[in-house]
């Protein structure tokens, strides 16, 4: 099996930096690029075995276009470490990459991975998803250690959807906790949110079982139960009376659930999907309803059987 020796990471935020730390600890040469880097994008990528995309969803297409314009060949394996959905066409990060790099193997890295905990050396697990078994195995080997357990699967779509959608739910749970609604309400919210995630997965054709793995339920639980989650913090701060702008300034980092909630609301409206939690989050973020009204609306919905 091919062994990765050089990795190029695009993105120098908390997540990209944590991934760099994991790879360096495994002996790989790591180059890291951002828009403020002195090293050029071409020099960062040249002869690297892994190209790791760790920029925000909003910046992914632009960076991918810059890479494509360099015409550096198709030898490297892409690793998508971005979570979110593009607002045009509801494309996942790996699909955006595949559109531009059809000949390169593309993998997805996702799971319950709070960057601060991993950077502190606390144990964690993740998933490398790809339809290319060899590429997945190479990336798995590059990241795996006694503190970071890495699994593989063959459902990149479901893996990415789980990672993107849980951010929206984390905002909702943050609101719930910020309003001090208790453990019962939080548990009900997370459980019904999983039903919404499964509906979206079914719509896009993802495998149901993926959402009960690390990149689905695992990521959902981590993001919805930890104050380290940026999306959870956004919801919590909104419930405390802060504006969205103030909440985002306070966390000083990208909260992908904000844009993903709006994308999901559009999807639900256009395709007739029942996504009441995501819809309420989108309205709350756009300041069309208050946190209290959002909870009241969910509780007042028509009674029904418990069906996914």
From Swiss-Prot:
Pfam family, one: NAD_Gly3P_dh_N
Catalytic activity annotation: sn-glycerol 3-phosphate + NAD(+) = dihydroxyacetone phosphate + NADH + H(+); sn-glycerol 3-phosphate + NADP(+) = dihydroxyacetone phosphate + NADPH + H(+)
Top-rank lineage group of the source organism: Bacteria
Compartment(s): Cytoplasm
GO MF entry, a single one: NAD binding
Enzyme superclass (EC): oxidoreductase
Pathway in which this enzyme or protein is active: Membrane lipid metabolism; glycerophospholipid metabolism
GO BP: carbohydrate metabolic process; glycerol-3-phosphate biosynthetic process; glycerol-3-phosphate catabolic process; glycerophospholipid metabolic process; phospholipid biosynthetic process
Binding site for sn-glycerol 3-phosphate: 83, 111, 166, 219, 229-231
Function: Catalyzes the reduction of the glycolytic intermediate dihydroxyacetone phosphate (DHAP) to sn-glycerol 3-phosphate (G3P), the key precursor for phospholipid synthesis.
Name this protein carries in UniProt: Glycerol-3-phosphate dehydrogenase [NAD(P)+]
Name of encoding gene: gpsA
